[in-house]
């Protein structure tokens, strides 16, 4: 029961952010723990797949809407792929960097690939961006980007989404460094990048 009660504050928060992004162009949900949860299972700190809950709820509200999921957590979004495969959803464009980019010598290739990843979302009406902190090179469960490279990742994502005119709702995703202030600093850099590109007050949503 306690787990069920958390749903409005996690998946519901991302859905609210996505609705706000459709209206305002950009919004943030301070939530994490989504992309490993699959069609019929919880996994890897993820109880519900809020990315897919949000996508399906938006599609129910707007039957022709197309959703992009840009997953830049360090780990592969296996739960998201599981749901997409089982439901055979062809209106969701899913890009998960955790399938390909894992090592420090891939940092430049990853950053250079961001424009192409965003371009894949060009037909989408909204993008859900998982801005993971666990790709940081010092993260115990991740590690291939420096702090500066993570900041550049976010700048490029927001710049290219803005240039394409695609609304974006972003969330925090993984981050496991201790003390927690190290993870918070990475999330603050994501916020700064978004604020700089969009030059608008951020919409912080409640469930």
Report each predicted region and the residues it spans:
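A general "terminal functional-core" signal
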Residues: 1-207
